[in-house]
Amino acid sequence: MPRDGNEGMFTIPGFSQIQFEGFCRFVDQGLMEEFHKFPKIEDTDQEIEFQLFVERYQLVEPLIKERDAVYESLTYSSELYVPAGLIWKTGRDMQEQTIFIGNIPLMNSLGTFIVNGIYRIVINQILQSPGIYYRSELDHNGISVYTSTIISDWGGRSELEIDRKSRIWARVSRKQKISILVLSSAMGSNLREILDNVCYPEIFLSFLNDREKKKIGSKENAILEFYQQFACVGGDPVFSESLCKELQKKFFQQRCELGRIGRRNMNRRLNLDIPQSNTFLLPRDVLAAADHLIGMKFGMGTLDDMNHLKNKRIRSVADLLQDQFGLALVRLENAVRGTICGAIRHKLILTPQNLVSSTSLTTTYESFFGLHPLSQVLDRTNPLTQIVHGRKLSYLGPGGLTGRTASFRIRDIHPSHYGRICPIDTSEGINVGLIGSLAIHARIGHWGSIESPFYEVYQRSKETKMVFLSPSRDEYYTVATGNSLALNRGGIQEEQIVPARYRQEFLTIAWEQIHLRSIFPFQYFSIGASLIPFIEHNDANRALMSSNMQRQAVPLSRSXXXXXXXXXXXXAALDSGVSAIAECEGKIIYTDTHKIVLSGHGDTISIPLVMYQRSNKNTCMHQNPQVRRGKCIKKGQILADGAATVGGELALGKNVLVAYMPWEGYNFEDAVLISERLVYEDIYTSFHIRKYEIQTHVTSQGPERITHEIPHLEAHLLRNLDRNGIVALGSWVETGDILVGKLTPQTANESSYAPEDRLLRAILGIQVSTAKETCLKLPIGGRGRVIDVRWIQKKGGSSYNPETIRVYISQKREIKVGDKVAGRHGNKGIISKILSRQDMPYLQDGTPVDMVFNPLGVPSRMNVGQIFECSLGLAGDLLDRHYRIAPFDERYEQEASRKLVFSELYEASKQTANPWVFEPEYPGKSRIFDGRTGDPFEQPVLIGKSYILKLIHQVDDKIHGRSSGHYALVTQQPLRGRAKQGGQRVGEMEVWALEGFGVAHILQEMLTYKSDHIRARQEVLGTTIIGGTIPTPEDAPESFRLLVRELRSLALELNHFLVSEKNFQINRKEA
């Protein structure tokens, strides 16, 4: 966090700083730590030795730029070179070469990675910290049972428990347990050492009978007993080296390796002084843990809170990349050993270059970024989404929890989260509480803990000093929850009582007992929550919805900044990287839509701008220049605004005139009524870019061809293709049009030709085409303008590297019925009707309202912040002011929010000479008129300017209909989902509903013709064309036949019979 000469000043830290620091730590420390673990490799005769000189490794600067890597679908990575030596011990010769061992993906300026042209981000994982934890549970008799859990660095767990007779057991599996004496002996201690290193030797001697003495008489006996219990082996196993190795691999390596964090935690919890370099569990640790467990039983010591953040650690991008690098080096070691053995066997010449392959490192990182749950595709819906995605904290992933097994206690807010993890911003649904977001000022410390900044309070001086505290330290201090404004730095009276936090409790205590105070009103919140004005007036559930929905806002074609916003809007837009920023001061000598040329310090710098780039959510990323030619600029000044930014500030939506009133039922249950002005004036118009791609392969019959000459297709469908067979730039394409013409060769026998084909060949000698048409066609709902075509040819040109053609089509989408809109307070709704301007309710000055919300959506949801924002937005619009709202302003003055809003409305009423803006009888409300009749409504209505967002959930992406399509092979029923042109499921309850209305024929159609009756649905088409009567299906549908076959597979025969009405003869029919 930057500091300047004024000690009392601070700035908001870079929001991507955590990602940058993690990657730098991996490059500076992690690489070398893993390199030092790489052993010297010898052959079986110990005549040849291979080793890496890791101190001289080199990371080469990437050959391509970030933008080119995205364009050409490549990985933005750095090549890693290491000097390697091959030593012949007999001749004492050494050959040294610098070898290439693989590519390491590099982090770019946004804190993300580019892998195969796709932006990916590695999110932080929060895990239980390795160490020892004590807890108490009640058994079935209601008696407290004390246990200690030792968690290893790998996540393995070992438990020590004490029974009613004060005997201590180590649980080695879910059902098996062994004596603590056997475990200590198996780890290498004898009885004398055990009794010398414990505080209660008499308790250990009390459960030492003759059988126990025999078990711990020697290390071999203890290991055999341990192995017998651990592996659940009967009989009398024999001690051997392989038995020790199996026990080492399956138990000790997974459950006893603490790591440096675990060793530190173990030393602090058990008051030990074992060196930090000793990261393995020792007999001394186990005996000290047993002593503490005995103390717990007799009421000494404190239990651990497993959900406290001091008992958690953050697994950052550095740890994940370092783990993968270590895995790659292990694979490299195995490959080198195999290559040396093979080369000696076949008497080949050995060099360091041909011993090492780069595939181990490259494929390890490719599989990590492609398959690991914590490596995710960067969500680029809008700038806020990009910056928030990298600050997520997840309990899920390898070594973590799952959404179905996590308890409520883990998901809940904990007092230690204060200033570190946002109490509001989390996902909805099954992962609620398991995926959180870092608070604005939080940072990750050296030991993997989350640290938060505070100011130290000096009673007799006015100077302030900022300190970062980990969760284990701040519970020893009294922390005032107010910031500098609330605590009145000019001089606080000694008798003043202030709210404070001490040892996970929230208290009100005297000012002279305060040790620390907060530095910022938004310190406790994440970026998403801190963008909500008047958040203190909202229910927490609605604030959660709002922080999630702001990330779903679509960048609009013309953005507008909010009239009432929070203080973090500029910092979020700046750190997202969507705006172009001057890297040095100078003068603008040229500007257009593609680039800005800057002259400064004798150099000319060309800054390329993003032009209609597609994000992975199909939104449009675009930059608009904000500087004119000849203008002098300073370093850090905004040169071009990106998507959803205005003047370098976040602008996700639009300020529109809203009214809270019912209107003919069209805003029932969160529906929203809007004016046609929002459509015709492109208020909520957005651009979306879709990508369509096709690949050409080399088949067994020959290579596929891209061509514009496609037989059997109408010329109308091929009208946009150029002579290469690819759609021309700037073409307007509709559903079904050909984007890329492609022919796939196929073999055709003489017998497979149709009769007319054979006749043409015999009479006219015309060669019938043997190629199949496999063109790229525009699917349903894809109409638009072609803005880019990319033909990507991979190097090598083999059949394993197919050519790829990508077509990008831009769509202009106005707001329409079915689209989803939302405010910043969790007030979301679906557009139900677009009303003409003259029919909308209008104000006393004749201005028609833009949106009508349901007033019943406010009291029950308790998101009253939207009312304050609505009224303050109206005042700001009339006074041409923008407001920055600090949260929890009631701490400065009672009813501070209401006083601010009413005073601004009163001033706006005076300056504009419009008394209806602020009427004392019903402040904030106004009499408005029905646009259809011109009569005033009975009650005054709340009107104002709200900041409303258009969300990514749009009706064009959701609406779907099916006449006929594909069927599942087994059940013969229509497929599921819009992408597969699927059908609508008619389940059991839907059938009941139709039966209740007595619509027998419709129900029969749904269950037969429209579903899985094969013969009946084939006959429907023919009878419909000729105008005949649709025949009634006679036999059973395919799903019933499937059921019969399933029963037959279980040796249950099921048949049905037809009984004649005339002579009651039974005709047996096979199902």
From Swiss-Prot:
Its UniProt entry gives the catalysed reaction(s) as:
RNA(n) + a ribonucleoside 5'-triphosphate = RNA(n+1) + diphosphate
- Annotated membrane-spanning segments are none
What sort of enzyme, by top EC class, is this?
transferase
Identify the SUPFAM superfamilies for this entry.
beta and beta-prime subunits of DNA dependent RNA-polymerase
Q: Name one GO cellular component term.
A: DNA-directed RNA polymerase complex
Q: Which UniProt keywords apply?
A: Chloroplast, DNA-directed RNA polymerase, Nucleotidyltransferase, Plastid, Transcription, Transferase
Gene Ontology molecular function terms on file: DNA binding; DNA-directed RNA polymerase activity; ribonucleoside binding
User: What PANTHER family does the database record attribute to this sequence?
Assistant: DNA-DIRECTED RNA POLYMERASE I SUBUNIT 2 (PTHR20856)
Subunit structure, per the record?
A: In plastids the minimal PEP RNA polymerase catalytic core is composed of four subunits: alpha, beta, beta', and beta''. When a (nuclear-encoded) sigma factor is associated with the core the holoenzyme is formed, which can initiate transcription.
Its protein name is: DNA-directed RNA polymerase subunit beta
What taxonomic classification does the UniProt entry list for its organism? Answer: Eukaryota, Viridiplantae, Streptophyta, Embryophyta, Tracheophyta
